[in-house]
C-alpha cells in the first residue's frame, strides 16, 4: 500500500490563508500499490462546509467524550475543565476563572448524582477519584488566582485524568450489538493500551473498542500475535501520515493461519447519537456530510485502518498515524473523516511520531492493559 499525491479539487476558501490553501491542495489520498486502484480524494462535497465552534484536538479529551455513558453532571464537570484549553494560551483569566468556578459548583452541588452513575461495587474507587478531583480543583483555583499558567495546565490535566477514570467506572455494558456477519472477526469490547517501540522511540496508543470494536479488535489481535514486530514504516509524508503494517511477501495484509485466507476488516465509523457504527460504506456514500464522529481525525496521532480506496471493507493489517498539524486546520475541517476507520489515538510519544519516516521500524508492540477486553472471533 502506498500514498499518492492528488489535487483535492474545489475547497471552500472561507477564512483560509493562501499558505494553508496551498497546503490543503497538496494533501494525499490513501491507496493500495496496485495499478488502477487509485481514486483521488477530490469530491468537493466533503469539503464544502466547516463545522462551527472549537474542534477538540486533544486525543485524551476525544477519548473521554467517546465513553458510552449517560451522566449529565459528570459531563458538565468535564466540559468546564475542557473549555480551559480554549483560553489558556491567550491567558484569558476571566474566562478561565469562570470555568473553574463552574467546575467547583458542579462537584459541590452534584456529587451525589455523579456518584449515582457508578455501580455500587465501584463506588469506593469513585469516591477516591472524587476526592482527588476536589484536591486538584482547590489547587487549580489557587493557580488561577496567581495567574500561574503552568500550574493551571498541570492541575487541569490531573483533574481531567481523574474525571476520565471516573467516567470509565460508569461504563457497565457494551453499548451495541456487532453485526452477525462480522462475528468471525476479533472484537475489542472496551479499551486497550498498546505500547509500541520504534527505532525512534516509544509510542503509547489507546485503542477504543467502544467506538470501533472490529478495527480495534483486529489491531489488538495482531499486536498480540506480534505481527507488527520488525515491520517497517512504508510511507511517511510530513504533516499528513505515517503508514505501517505491510507484511513481507506478496500479501497486502494478514493471512489467518487457520483459514489461510486474507482477513478483511470493514470500514467502521460511529457517528455520535447513532445506536452503533456504520459499516461498509463511507459517510459520503451514506449521505452524511461532516457529522460529529465519536473518533474524528481532529487529533495529531489518530490511528486508522488503511484500505483500498474503492473497497471500504478491504483493509487488513496496514494502518496509518494521522500527522496533519491541527493548528493549521480550521475547526472541524477534517478531510479524512468518514472515509477511514479511526480506532484510537497516540496519547504519549508525539515527539517520536514526529520523527518517524519511511524506512524506520516497529521494534515491538505489546498490549499493556485491556487485553482481557479482546474477544476472538470464529477464525
Curated annotation (Swiss-Prot):
Entry's localization field: Cellular thylakoid lumen
Keyword annotations of the record: Isomerase, Rotamase, Signal, Thylakoid
Domain called PPIase cyclophilin-type: residue spans: 190-378
GO cellular component, one term: plasma membrane-derived thylakoid lumen
Signal peptide interval: 1-33
Gene Ontology terms for molecular function: peptidyl-prolyl cis-trans isomerase activity
Gene3D superfamilies: Cyclophilin-like, Oxygen-evolving enhancer protein 3 (PsbQ), four-helix up-down bundle
Top-level taxon of the source organism: Bacteria
Primary location recorded for the protein, binned into one broad class: other
EC number, UniProt record: 5.2.1.8
Pfam families from the UniProt entry: CYP38_PsbQ-like (PF21329), Pro_isomerase (PF00160)
InterPro entries membership: Cyclophilin-like_dom_sf (IPR029000), Cyclophilin-type_PPIase_dom (IPR002130), CYP38_PsbQ-like (IPR048563), E_coli_cyclophilin_A-like (IPR044665), PsbQ-like_dom_sf (IPR023222)
Uppermost EC category: isomerase
Catalytically driven reaction(s): [protein]-peptidylproline (omega=180) = [protein]-peptidylproline (omega=0)
Function: PPIases accelerate the folding of proteins. It catalyzes the cis-trans isomerization of proline imidic peptide bonds in oligopeptides. Required for the assembly and stabilization of PSII.
PANTHER family the UniProt entry points to: PEPTIDYL-PROLYL CIS-TRANS ISOMERASE CYP38, CHLOROPLASTIC (PTHR43246)
Protein name: Putative thylakoid lumen peptidyl-prolyl cis-trans isomerase sll0408
Lineage start: Bacteria, Bacillati, Cyanobacteriota, Cyanophyceae, Synechococcales
Amino acid at each position: 500500500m502506498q500514498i499518492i499525491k492528488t489535487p483535492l479539487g474545489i475547497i471552500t476558501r472561507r477564512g483560509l490563508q493562501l499558505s494553508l490553501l496551498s497546503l490543503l491542495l497538496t494533501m494525499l489520498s490513501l491507496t493500495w500499490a496496485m495499478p488502477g486502484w487509485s481514486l483521488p480524494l477530490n469530491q468537493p462535497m466533503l469539503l464544502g462546509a466547516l463545522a462551527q465552534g472549537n474542534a477538540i484536538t486533544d486525543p485524551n479529551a476525544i477519548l473521554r467524550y467517546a465513553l458510552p455513558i449517560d451522566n449529565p453532571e459528570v459531563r458538565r464537570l468535564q466540559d468546564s475543565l475542557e473549555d480551559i484549553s480554549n483560553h489558556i494560551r491567550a491567558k484569558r483569566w476571566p474566562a478561565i476563572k469562570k470555568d473553574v468556578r463552574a467546575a467547583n459548583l458542579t462537584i459541590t452541588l452534584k456529587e451525589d448524582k455523579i456518584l449515582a452513575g457508578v455501580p455500587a461495587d465501584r463506588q469506593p474507587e469513585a469516591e477516591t477519584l472524587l476526592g482527588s478531583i476536589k484536591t486538584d480543583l482547590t489547587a487549580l483555583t489557587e493557580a488561577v488566582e496567581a495567574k500561574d499558567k503552568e500550574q493551571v495546565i498541570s492541575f487541569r490535566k490531573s483533574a481531567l485524568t481523574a474525571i476520565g477514570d471516573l467516567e470509565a467506572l460508569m461504563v457497565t455494558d457494551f453499548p451495541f450489538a456487532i453485526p452477525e456477519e462480522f462475528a468471525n472477526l476479533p472484537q475489542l469490547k472496551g479499551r486497550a493500551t498498546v505500547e509500541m517501540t520504534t527505532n525512534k522511540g516509544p509510542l503509547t496508543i489507546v485503542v477504543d473498542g467502544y467506538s470501533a470494536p472490529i478495527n480495534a479488535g483486529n489491531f489488538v489481535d495482531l499486536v498480540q500475535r506480534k505481527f507488527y514486530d520488525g515491520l517497517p514504516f512504508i510511507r511517511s509524508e510530513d504533516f499528513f501520515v505515517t503508514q505501517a503494517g505491510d507484511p513481507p511477501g506478496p500479501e497486502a495484509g494478514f493471512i489467518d493461519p487457520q483459514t489461510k485466507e486474507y482477513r478483511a476488516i470493514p470500514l467502521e465509523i460511529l457517528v455520535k447519537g447513532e445506536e452503533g457504527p456504520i459499516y461498509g460504506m463511507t459517510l459520503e456514500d451514506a449521505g452524511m456530510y461532516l457529522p460529529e464522529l465519536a473518533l474524528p481525525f481532529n487529533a495529531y496521532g489518530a490511528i486508522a485502518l488503511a484500505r483500498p480506496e474503492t473497497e471500504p471493507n478491504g483493509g487488513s493489517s496496514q494502518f496509518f498515524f494521522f500527522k496533519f498539524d491541527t493548528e493549521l486546520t480550521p475547526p472541524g475541517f477534517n478531510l479524512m473523516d468518514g472515509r477511514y476507520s479511526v480506532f484510537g489515538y497516540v496519547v504519549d510519544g508525539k515527539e517520536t511520531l514526529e520523527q518517524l519516516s519511511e524506512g524506520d521500524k516497529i521494534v515491538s508492540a505489546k498490549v499493556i492493559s485491556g487485553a482481557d477486553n479482546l474477544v476472538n472471533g470464529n477464525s
